Amino acid sequence: MKSPKELTLERRLLRILEEGSHSHALAQTLVADEEIQNIQDYGNNVSIKRLGFNDHGPVHMRQVAINALTMLRLLHQAGIPMSLEKEQVGTYDDSACAVLLASFLHDLGMSIGRQDHELMSAIIARPIIRRLLEGLEGLDARRRTMIECMALEGIVGHMATRRIHSLEAGLILIADGCDMEKGRARIPLAISLGGQEAHYGDIHKYSANSIEHVRIDKGQTKPIRITVHMSSEVGCFQIEEVLIPKINMSPSKPFVELVALVGGESERHYL
């Protein structure tokens, strides 16, 4: 059974997309797909209970999808053509489909393990992507193939260990890095410190636990502004060691402002 948080995120996700579009229909199919739900749930079990990492399950992937599609829409509203549009091979909605698929499926590989999970995610996701795209009316084989390939680019590139080249794929790793609010760290932090000493890697959980809120909206000088609200300085670790490396590897970097706020202090501009 889905959690209230998952259902809330699904409603937010559907509101971002235009009703009647392929991307909206695809989102409806994604959130209702039993196979995807089962893989996401089990992957979260592996991540939190077996490996001691933070949330990599259905809540995380829905939040990343919201983050990515929010940034996609901001670029579109600013008149920035996505790679498929610029190359005159696809539409904005094709890009939205690819971004949606990549973000919603990017961590399926955590159901196997952490090492090379982005590659495992692509392997697991490919037949699912094909099945879902074949169910959309009005998409010919050429467009389905194009969307599939771009979605896979976003999945394999989300760890910032492989060079990616499209704006669409570049949004996935930034969107992933933006999901660092304290709620994502609370469960594994409680498990890891339940009567035990803190161990190597807990800095990620402590730093994420100091992130109060991440806001993505229209920038002042660039189309996208990411504002990270923190309760303490330790949250800077999450920004500097997780988010910024992903932004630096993203083709979408030129369009992003990054600002941090610690308590009531003035803004810290990273980008």
Roles of regions detected by a PLM:
Residues 116, 129-164:
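Contiguous mid-protein beta-loop-alpha structural module that forms a pocket-lining wall or clamp
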Residues 114-127:
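Post-HEXXH active-site segment of zinc metalloproteases
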Residues 25-48:
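Short alpha-helical hairpin
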Residues 1-29, 52-55, 59, 66-93, ...:
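Divalent metal-dependent phosphate-bond-processing catalytic cores, especially two-metal-ion Mg2+/Mn2+ enzymes
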Residues 98-102:
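Active-site alpha-helix of zinc metalloproteases
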Residues 122, 152, 168-171:
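A general structural signal for well-ordered alpha-helical packing
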Residues 64-65, 122:
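Hydrophobic face of alpha-helices
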Residues 60-61, 95, 151:
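Hydrophobic alpha-helical transmembrane segments of integral membrane proteins
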